[in-house]
Structures are given as C-alpha cells and as structure tokens.
Design a protein with these regions (language model features):
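Catalytic-site signature of metal-activated, phosphate-bearing donor transferases
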Residues: 1-29, 108-126, 141-316
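Active-site-proximal specificity loops/subdomain of glycosyltransferases
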Residues: 13-36, 75-133
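Short, well-formed alpha-helical segments that are part of the catalytic scaffolds
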Residues: 19-27, 44-64, 76
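Active-site beta-to-alpha loop of glycosyltransferases that engages the nucleotide-sugar donor
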Residues: 33-36, 40-54, 69
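Residue-level detector of structured alpha->beta connecting loops
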Residues: 60-61, 130, 159
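Short beta-strand/loop segment that forms part of the nucleotide-sugar
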Residues: 61-72, 92-96
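A structural signal for short, well-ordered beta-strand segments and their strand-loop junctions
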Residues: 65, 133-136, 164-168
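Short beta-strand-to-loop acidic/aromatic patch adjacent to the donor-nucleotide binding site
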Residues: 131-144
Length: 316
C-alpha cells in the first residue's frame, strides 16, 4: 500500500542535508493560522520584482520569496520593493542553495527525494509557510487591478475550505519600456490557489512537478484578464527547460509550444495572429499600462481567441 506523501511528519532528502529536510506546516507545534501566502520560487528575476510584488503584498497576508541561486540581486531588490511600500512586515525571503533540475529530461532523471528535484524543491518552499492557504506564484506574474482585488477577496474567503482556484494569465512579451505584445491566442487557466494540508502536496510528474489532490474538492475558475506573465524579449525565456525537445510533442506542453512560436516570431520581427501590439503613453511603463489601464478597460466579458482549446476541450 502506498502511503500518501503528506501523511507523515515530513520528508528527508537522499543527500542527507538535514537543514533542508521538510516538516509539514500542519505538524509544527504552533500549527497554521488563517490567511493566505503567495509563494514565489525565483532565479534571476530582478527586473520583474517592482511589478510582481506590489499587488501581491497588498492582496495577501504574506509573500514568501524563495531565491534559488540568483546572481542578479533578485532577493535584495525584492526586499527593497517591500520596504519601499511599507509592507516589509508581510515579506519573507528564503534561500534555497541547490541547483534544481530543469523541466523535461533533467527533471525526469532526478530522484524525487533529491534536493535537486522540482517536487522536493516545491514541497520545501511551501513547507516554509504558516497560513492555511497558499498561492503558487511565479516571479514573472503580475496581477491587474482587478486581479489584485479578486485575490484579496479570495485570500480570506477560501482559507477554511478545500477549494482550488484556477487563475488565468496571458503572456506579455516586453520589447521595451514602452512597447509590449499581449498574446490573446492562448487560453491558459492553471490551478494556482491551494489549501495547505496533507492532501495538497507535490509529487513527480513526467515533465515537471504536480500537486496531489483528494478525490473530492471544489474548483473555482476566475475570469480572463486578471494576470499577465512577463516575458522579456532580451532575456532567456526557456532557460528552465532542458531543451526544446522536452516540450515538442506532448499535449500537456501545448502552452509552451505556443510561447516558443510567439517568442521566435517576435524575435524575427513578426507579430503572430492573435497577438496584440501595445504602446504605452509617454512616461508610463508598458507593464503598468497593460495591468492598470489596458486590460481593466478592455470590454467584458474578456475573451481569448484560442481555437485549439475549444477544439480539444482542454482544461487549461
């Protein structure tokens, strides 16, 4: 009989790094408190921190940022942003000093109980929280004004029930401070909000980590237009993947193939179908323009034209 991952006291890693063994939050003497924590796992996201953190800090009870071997000052910049907002008391910085396997072939070849495993890394990160609810958040995801209000409302409403929140996001490809390209040709609604309990922990899946769920739980999808995912065209967007072949064929990787298509087209000076070119007004950064003005003012219901999604009846 298989024992559920979250059933025991915690997890130990095969390398014997006792300082990075995992104790599940629900087993700690102090227990868990009501509220919600946004958990960010980041590496070299310094340019995104000033956009990502402010709405999260306002919307959540706590923001936990786990820095995984950044060498660009991401942790320092995140600390500065939180302090500048007067919300440093909501911000927690942790360091994870081990190289983590990239999604795809590297992940598949890594033992699930290794400190280098994506699943172990995610479990360690979320084990640092103290609230009953968590948001799995990326270091390049920026809430719109509507998204911030929605997350703030949900963070106190869902803390006592087994509810999973599916949060939509749209790729925003940044060409400069004044120009970006918004991909409205991909419907991407993933599960980002989870209770912190033994039923909701991470395990190994073929290309990446996946969160376990009980047989019965409630799922609440949010509407489109609440969040963008920053993709800097002068950066290395696919560094966390082993190679392009790792997402070349699987239906699960349809989103990554779309991003690869859009990224390479824009690099070649072409704007793909269903990608919208957006110019910010003078003196306003294009990320602020899109999240505070363009998306909130777009007609509702906000729709994404993704024929493949409708044709294949995909979940996300």
């Amino acid at each position: 009989m298989n024992i559920p991952i979250g059933a025991g006291h915690g997890l130990s890693n095969i390398e014997g790094h006792a300082d990075f063994d995992i104790v599940w939050p629900w087993n700690r003497p102090e227990g868990q408190r009501r509220g919600a924590t946004a958990v960010l796992r980041v590496r070299n996201e310094v340019d995104s921190m000033r956009f990502v953190l402010p709405p999260l800090l306002r919307a959540c009870d706590e923001v936990l940022l786990v820095d995984n071997l950044s060498d660009d000052g991401t942790g320092e910049e995140a600390t500065r942003v939180a302090a500048e907002l007067g919300l440093g008391h909501k911000f927690v910085l942790r360091e994870y000093p081990f190289a983590v396997a990239r999604a795809g072939a590297e992940h598949l070849a890594t033992n699930e109980r290794s400190v280098h495993s994506l699943a172990y890394f995610y479990n360690w990160c979320f084990a640092q929280t103290s609230t009953r609810y968590t948001w799995k958040w990326d270091g390049d995801m920026v809430l719109t004004t509507e998204g911030e209000a929605s997350m703030a409302d949900l963070s106190w409403q869902v803390g006592m029930v087994d509810a999973v929140i599916r949060f939509p996001r749209h790729g925003l490809y940044i060409a400069s401070e004044s120009k970006a390209y918004l991909d409205l040709g991909l419907r991407n609604v993933e599960e980002w909000g989870f209770p912190m309990s033994p039923d909701f922990v991470y395990t190994k899946a073929p290309e990446w980590e996946i969160r376990t769920t009980p047989d019965e739980f409630r799922v609440f999808p949010l509407p489109q237009g609440l969040c963008v995912e920053l993709k800097w065209l002068d950066g290395d967007e696919f560094a966390h993947w082993s190679n392009p072949e790792s997402f070349a064929t699987s239906l699960r990787n349809r989103r990554k193939r779309r991003e690869w298509e859009v990224w390479n087209a824009l690099q070649a000076g072409e704007v793909p179908e269903r990608v919208v070119e957006i110019d910010a007004p003078p003196g306003v950064h294009v990320v602020d323009h899109v999240t505070r003005t363009w998306l909130p003012q777009a007609p509702r219901p906000f729709e994404v034209d993704d024929p493949d999604h409708a044709k294949k009846h995909l979940r996300a």
